[in-house]
Regions:
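Predominantly flavin-linked oxidoreductase catalytic cores and closely associated redox partners
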Residues: 106-240
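A conserved beta-strand/loop capping segment in the N-terminal third of enzymes
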Residues: 53-104
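An active-site-proximal "capping" alpha-helix that borders the catalytic cofactor pocket
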Residues: 56, 290-307, 313
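Beta1/beta-strand and adjacent pyrophosphate-binding region of the FAD-binding site
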Residues: 1-15
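Conserved N-terminal glycine-rich FAD pyrophosphate-binding loop of Rossmann-like flavoproteins
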Residues: 37-57, 71
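FAD/FMN-dependent oxidoreductases across multiple families
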Residues: 122, 139, 220-300
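C-terminal helical "tail/cap" subdomain of flavin- and related membrane-associated enzymes
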Residues: 302-384
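Glycine-rich FAD pyrophosphate-binding loop
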Residues: 21-44
């Protein structure tokens, strides 16, 4: 076994890398373990709200320099005309492939040790030390363990099902036809269809990210085939069908993930420190997953460096995010049911401002940002 580190961070996503950088910059001996050996894509909407942008800049990253593209509007469509409005806050889009690599590099520059290509298989606490067994058979040890494995659970540390556990997630990058790319513009478009919803938004390089959720039973009824799901979405949502007509997939097949505990929030400590999706899983339409991940990392660093334990951190984080996760989950439960979709679309036709209000209601609260040392007003300020 190698030396005993101050901190063991399992997971090289947004939460894990941000935490590793903060702790390493404070002089801690940090080992970050990431199962992927190189750059890779992940199932993620890739939406960066103003809160996420502030946290990234605090880490010394400039998302615009990395290629982030602005997202100015949001729309929702069903069988009829799309309802579109201006987002009440600044937002951007950046692929996880590019963002995560920049965060990993920043953590390494701060002094964290990166170990890539062998994820953790087990994590145990013995004699006051945390020990992890990696996929290559080696073992590592640390005084504190931070679980930041994203949507993937570690054996023995599985999260309980959330209020909405029956969804499958898919993601695919596309090159839209030039006319449809121009029509999409700087917007994130939410497309409803029986059994689920999809989000389409631009990312760097002139590409678009299609990320969607569908109820497991509906996907099974379609034969469990991606092509059948595509046909189903196009038949049920003319707006989405138009956007995707003639689009070129940039990957051989979509990424997929199951058993996501949407609506889950870790409200008490269980020994290790849980960050990001391991601590709170907000439904994808809200676009606040990366903000929560970054907030959890900064809060965990502040608590750890200030002498608090994992249980105190978990309670504070739950207090910050429970409300917005609950509200987003209620909306998401409506979005995958036919009657709920009809109710929402009817409400948007009568109250168009409700779309912007819903977007604003699923952001990190101002009090949480202040506790993170951020100015909430800056999260609402659009770049000059």
């Amino acid at each position: 076994m190698s030396r005993t580190h101050d901190a063991l961070v399992l997971g090289g996503g947004v939460a894990g890398t941000a935490l590793a950088q903060r702790l390493a910059a404070a002089g801690r001996d940090v080992l970050l373990v990431e199962r992927q050996a190189g750059p890779h894509d992940k199932v993620c909407g890739e939406f960066l709200s103003g809160e996420a942008m502030l946290y990234l800049r605090r880490l010394g990253l400039d998302p615009l320099a990395l290629g982030a593209v602005p997202v100015e509007q949001v729309s929702v469509s069903g069988r009829g005309r799309a309802q579109r409005c201006r987002l009440p806050f600044p937002a951007f889009s950046l692929s996880r492939r590019r963002l995560d690599e920049a965060l990993l590099a920043a953590a390494a520059t701060a002094g964290a040790t990166l170990r890539r290509g062998a994820g953790a298989r087990a994590l145990d606490c013995r004699g006051g030390l945390w020990e992890a067994r990696l996929e290559d058979g080696s073992q590592v040890a640390a005084r504190q363990a931070f679980l930041a494995t994203g949507k993937h659970d570690l054996r023995g540390w599985r999260r309980p099902p959330g209020p909405q556990p029956d969804l499958l997630g898919f993601k695919l990058h596309l090159r839209l036809r030039p006319d449809e790319a121009a029509a999409l513009g700087q917007a994130v478009e939410i497309a409803l269809f029986p059994g689920g919803y999809a989000g389409l938004q631009p990312v760097e390089g002139g590409h678009a990210n299609l990320c969607l959720l569908v109820r497991r039973g509906h996907f099974a009824a379609l034969g469990g085939e991606w092509a059948a799901l595509q046909r189903h979405m196009a038949a049920q949502n003319p707006h989405l069908a138009s956007r995707l007509a003639g689009a070129t997939p940039l990957w051989e097949r979509p990424l997929a993930i199951a058993a996501i505990p949407y609506g889950f929030v870790q409200r008490s400590g269980d020994g290790c420190w849980r960050l990001g999706d391991q601590a709170a899983v907000i439904p994808s339409f809200a676009g606040e997953g990366m903000s929560i991940a970054l907030h959890s990392a900064h809060l965990a660093a502040a608590c750890h460096l200030g002498g608090d334990d994992a249980a105190a951190f978990q309670r504070r984080l739950a207090g910050d995010v429970s409300g917005l996760v609950r509200r987003a989950t209620l909306v998401s439960q409506l979005l995958v049911r036919g009657w709920g979709q009809a109710l929402l679309l009817g409400g948007l036709r009568g109250l168009p401002f409700a779309l912007a209000a819903t977007a604003a209601a699923t952001r990190l609260p101002a009090a949480a940002l202040r506790r993170g040392g951020l100015d909430p007003a800056e999260a609402l300020a659009r770049p000059a």
